[in-house]
Amino acid sequence: MLGFITRPPHQLLCTGYRLLRTPVLCTQPRPRTMSSSTSWELPLVAVCQVTSTPNKQENFKTCAELVQEAARLGACLAFLPEAFDFIARNPAETLLLSEPLNGDLLGQYSQLARECGIWLSLGGFHERGQDWEQNQKIYNCHVLLNSKGSVVASYRKTHLCDVEIPGQGPMRESNYTKPGGTLEPPVKTPAGKVGLAICYDMRFPELSLKLAQAGAEILTYPSAFGSVTGPAHWEVLLRARAIESQCYVIAAAQCGRHHETRASYGHSMVVDPWGTVVARCSEGPGLCLARIDLHFLQQMRQHLPVFQHRRPDLYGSLGHPLS
């Protein structure tokens, strides 16, 4: 179903395809002074793109097929988008369909990780926390499972999307979601140290810099961007986060029409620390693959030592709102 082509050391494999479709293969040039390791020595990651609906079991079936395909192709880690579990028609349905982390649905994904022998980034689970009974609000929770199906990290989205975009309609995530209170330290995985974030978080460079400072080599932004902000901001933001943090950026995305009133932009992608898009999905559900070259990342940081040139003495009020 998917073919690979051996590339010169300064180029990366870029693949993207829809299920039952011919793959798209391309190469991306790198700065001549920076070399890569032999491609077959590098860990392979898979970025999954889906169209979630309110039907949780149908969504699981779709995600499971993509994860199984990723494992068959040799990926060590598969990334699923925000709201991989479901996208409801309204806030009331969202709350009704939500589950705790120890619920049945996450148990199915744990079993899937075990059976496939693959790590899973579950990019935005509608979590009923321990305070559910008190406030009837959920968390938007990014869960990381290892290949044994164990939860090794969970991050609750800290920046909630309360916006009004002309042509896209209002979004009030805080009406039914509580913000998380902390960042999760980067997690060591077979692909590198992964920093967890979710969708709207990508608009806050402070978060990406904080995760990079804490040791992240890969930043992941599972998302469900809309049809207006997607074309305007999606790729620009992801490339900016990669360049400023000198990390790989992996963004699994929702795509297509979820129900009568909701659609997502798609265009899942992987960006390297130079800011090059090294893999992207085609239109519709499917996955793309990329190899993570940490030697190239270290070279980037050596040749452009921006973290050594930072002036924190000048940035004291950076996290404050505009006056």
From Swiss-Prot:
Note from the entry: According to Rosetta Stone theory, the existence of a fusion protein in one genome predicts that the separate polypeptides expressed in other organisms function in the same cellular or biochemical pathway. In Drosophila melanogaster and Caenorhabditis elegans, NitFhit is a fusion protein composed of a C-terminal Fhit domain and a domain related to plant and bacterial nitrilase.
Q: Would I find Mitochondrion among this entry's keywords?
A: yes
- Every CN hydrolase domain range: 42-294
Q: Which domain of life does the UniProt lineage start with?
A: Eukaryota
Gene3D superfamilies reported for this sequence: Carbon-nitrogen hydrolase
UniProt keyword Acetylation, yes or no: no
Catalyzed reactions: N-(4-oxoglutaryl)-L-cysteinylglycine + H2O = L-cysteinylglycine + 2-oxoglutarate; N-(4-carboxy-4-oxobutanoyl)-L-ethylglycylglycine + H2O = N-(2-aminobutanoyl)glycine + 2-oxoglutarate
Q: Report, from the record, the phenotype seen after gene disruption.
A: Mice are normal at birth as well as during growth. Mammary glands exhibit an increase in ductal and alveolar structures as well as more cyclin-D1 positive cells in mid-pregnancy. In the basal layer of epidermis, the number of cyclin-D1 positive cells is also higher. No lymphoid malignancy is observed. Kidney cells lacking Nit1 exhibit round and compact shapes, loss of lobular structure, higher cell density with increased S and G2/M cell populations. Cyclin D1 expression is increased, whereas differences in the other cell cycle-associated proteins appeared minimal.
- Provide the GO biological process annotations: amide catabolic process
Q: Which Pfam families match?
A: CN_hydrolase
Q: Report the gene name.
A: Nit1
The cross-references to SUPFAM superfamilies, in alphabetical order and at most eight, read: Carbon-nitrogen hydrolase
Molecular functions (GO terms) = [acetyl-CoA carboxylase]-phosphatase activity; deaminated glutathione amidase activity
Disulfide connectivity? none
Can you tell me which residues form the catalytic site? 82, 157, 199
Looking up InterPro entries in the UniProt record yields:
C-N_Hydrolase, C-N_Hydrolase_sf, Nit1/2_C-N_Hydrolase, UPF0012_CS
EC assignment: 3.5.1.128
> Which keywords annotate this record?
Cytoplasm, Hydrolase, Mitochondrion, Transit peptide
Name the UniProt record assigns to this protein: Deaminated glutathione amidase
Transit peptide endpoints, chain numbering: 1-33
Q: In which tissues is it expressed?
A: Expressed in most tissues with higher expression in adult liver and kidney as well as in fetal adrenal gland and skeletal muscle.
What is the source species? Mus musculus
Under the heading PROSITE patterns, the entry gives: CN_HYDROLASE, UPF0012
Its biological purpose:
Catalyzes the hydrolysis of the amide bond in N-(4-oxoglutarate)-L-cysteinylglycine (deaminated glutathione), a metabolite repair reaction to dispose of the harmful deaminated glutathione. Possesses amidase activity toward deaminated ophthalmate in vitro. Plays a role in cell growth and apoptosis: loss of expression promotes cell growth, resistance to DNA damage stress and increased incidence to NMBA-induced tumors. Has tumor suppressor properties that enhances the apoptotic responsiveness in cancer cells; this effect is additive to the tumor suppressor activity of FHIT.
Family designation: Belongs to the carbon-nitrogen hydrolase superfamily. NIT1/NIT2 family.
Q: Which GO terms describe its cellular component?
A: cytoplasm; mitochondrion
